[in-house]
UniProtKB/Swiss-Prot annotation:
Coiled-coil ranges per UniProt: none
Transmembrane segments: 285-305
Virion surface side: 1-284
Family: Belongs to the orthopoxvirus OPG108 family.
Record carries keyword Transmembrane: yes
Further details from the record: Immunodominant protein.
Protein name: Envelope protein OPG108
Species in which this protein is naturally found: Vaccinia virus (strain Western Reserve) (VACV)
A biological-process GO annotation: virion attachment to host cell
Modified how: Does not contain disulfide bonds.
One Gene Ontology cellular component annotation held by this UniProt entry: viral envelope
Membrane topology label: Single-pass membrane protein
Length: 324
């Protein structure tokens, strides 16, 4: 018995080879490489083949692909994914990352997958690492059996959860819980028809506003989409915040603070990732991240209390030029 290969799609958010996201792929398939697919392209025919059921080599279940479309820096045709407000006030990084996913969902590639009756795709941003993919086969089967539309493989909120058994066998004990507003596009498995329906609804509604994750959750509720979140997701998908934090510092203007930040990222990756997270765009002129917001609040404090220290004003000025 045979079935169509499930696409495993790597979405680039940093400068990194897709094989680093799946470091063991070449050990299993000698001629395996990641085919690049961009706008207006479909899956290469040589990868669109069938696999034998229960093949002991799990890597042969999948067609490994790197998505290179949706680059808003090179093309303005993706502006319809965002409302006028978001096109002005959403940060460059937010629009860039979201556009890559929405352009993928709205691409000929996914229309072709629907025509060929491919049920699910696995999508992973390249700041993640999945060393062992053997959990995917039973997870995909369980998603089909339990009518799960989306399995999010990165947890945003920690705390007490009502967990449901997804897979229980001799190799895996996997649980999930129902998602709410804790939406992440970092790594997920999604039904092809669900993707097409979501992106169609986004476009018809005039594009996303600044509250992207709230809007996705709203659409899920309206369309009765079953999104589950993988419990203990870091066990299966390792997200490295250092990679994105370093990428952000590398794209800053070279200065003393950017070098300090790059060094601090190696020791405190989670903290620096949070501090460099962009929050809002100032009418498309520049983006303000967490550090920038702190600097703005500090400037307001100094103005209110009439601080006259030249050293403090000098240091604040260097922060402004570095982070705002």
């Amino acid at each position: 018995m045979a079935a169509a290969k499930t696409p495993v799609i790597v979405v680039p958010v940093i400068d990194r080879l897709p094989s680093e996201t799946f470091p063991n792929v070449h050990e299993h398939i000698n001629d395996q490489k990641f085919d690049d697919v961009k706008d207006n392209e479909v899956m290469p025919e040589k990868r669109n083949v069938v696999v034998v059921k229960d093949d002991p080599d799990h890597y042969k279940d999948y067609a490994f692909i790197q998505w290179t479309g949706g680059n808003i820096r090179n093309d303005d045709k993706y502006t319809h994914f965002f409302s006028g407000f978001c096109n002005t006030m959403c940060t460059e990084e937010t629009k860039r990352n979201i556009a890559r996913h929405l352009a993928l969902w709205d691409s000929n590639f996914f229309t072709e997958l629907e025509n060929k009756k491919v049920e699910y795709v696995v999508i992973v941003e390249n700041d993640n690492v999945i060393e062992d993919i053997t959990f995917l086969r039973p997870v995909l089967k369980a998603m089909h059996d339990k009518k799960i539309d989306i399995l999010q493989m990165r947890e945003i909120i920690t705390g007490n959860k009502v967990k449901t058994e997804l897979v229980m066998d001799k190799n895996h004990a996997i649980f999930t819980y129902t998602g709410g507003y804790d939406v992440s596009l970092s790594a997920y498995i999604i039904r092809v028809t669900t993707e097409l329906n979501i992106v169609d609804e986004i476009i018809k509604s005039g594009g996303l506003s600044s509250g992207f994750y709230f809007e996705i959750a709203r659409i899920e509720n309206e369309m009765k989409i079953n999104r589950q979140i993988l419990d203990n997701a870091a066990k299966y998908v390792e997200h490295d915040p250092r990679l994105v934090a370093e990428h952000r510092f590398e794209n800053m203007k070279p200065n003393f603070w950017s070098r300090i930040g790059t060094a601090a990222t190696k020791r405190y990756p989670g903290v620096m990732y949070a501090f460099t997270t962009p929050l809002i765009s100032f009418f498309g002129l520049f983006d303000i991240n967490v550090i920038g917001l702190i600097v703005i609040l500090f400037i307001m404090f100094m103005l209110i209390f009439n601080v006259k220290s030249k050293l403090l004003w000098f240091l604040t000025g260097t922060f402004v030029t570095a982070f705002i």
